[in-house]
């Protein structure tokens, strides 16, 4: 395998968003930079948005120009601008026509969805692109001997952040977080090929 690792196939994402979200923890978000260098960081915090019945989901009111990508095939990036400032990175899940996705909220060393996209130079240009090495942004199986999917005892489930408007759905435990100290650290230049990485600090709660 190259430094970007073994990409997850589209079929991995063609499942309910909550199942995909849980299994994404510990996998690697991989970005090819403008200089051609590879950055690879473990996913440590995600949120699931289950579809039109989920009152916190962008697709609850039907397709629009902004959310059209959510109604397409699984394994495609859905990237939108929040408050006119921060790009939010999501991966589409489930069946075509059923708007569901997983929001990337944190990777090892970078916590907060806006910080992730800023730190990795991800913007709206990735919206609608498949999560493959050919597009320069993908998710790979973890390197460094990480046990994956992660054991349930490593994962905390909580309500999602910033969805108080969603009624009963605001309390659903659809945010998934893992202690980043259990995962190998990927340095800023790329992957640690020998699995000798130092542990990160635990994920900060907000």
Put a short name on every predicted segment.
Residues 1-206:
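Conserved, well-structured core segments that form or line functional sites
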